[in-house]
Amino acid sequence: MHNTVFRYELNAMTRRTFGFDFENWMQNGFRAEEYIPYSFEEKGRIVANVSVNWMFFNKNGEEQLCFQLGTVMEDKAYRSRGLIWQLMERILERYDGIETGIYLFGNLGALDFYRKLGFRELMQYEYTLKPGVIKREGRHFRPVKKDALALR
């Protein structure tokens, strides 16, 4: 997300869709290399996006590289054109064969869509740390919404 114009457009669409953006996150030194947006744009405006966010998890005492599919959004005027499906297929093809975990937190209305792509529901756990435990260097925890559902 080093392209300032693209970052501005991605943040604008994220604000319209979810009511937040990533600018503070970027300005506070969190690494953009781990956040990879896949987008369709028209006339310089992002109209659909799915992002890959790389992170490490501790699974049974072993560190495992995983990626989260997030910031899944589509401009209302572009819905029902298959843009998100195309982006998801492109991402899954791109990382096919890489030994990693893939997960997302899908909204309940999109579960059938994700199932068609091969995702399945799994048990979800939530862990928290007291403020000040995490330093800016190294790997970071990401917030998890309580009503989210993990798939694939």
Model feature map: region roles:
Residues 63-76:
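Conserved acetyl-CoA binding element of GNAT-fold acetyltransferases
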Residues 1-48, 68, 135-152:
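Short amphipathic alpha-helix that is part of the acyltransferase structural core
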Residues 74, 79-93:
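Conserved acetyl-CoA-binding loop-helix of GNAT-fold acetyltransferases
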Residues 42-62:
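Acetyl-CoA-dependent GNAT
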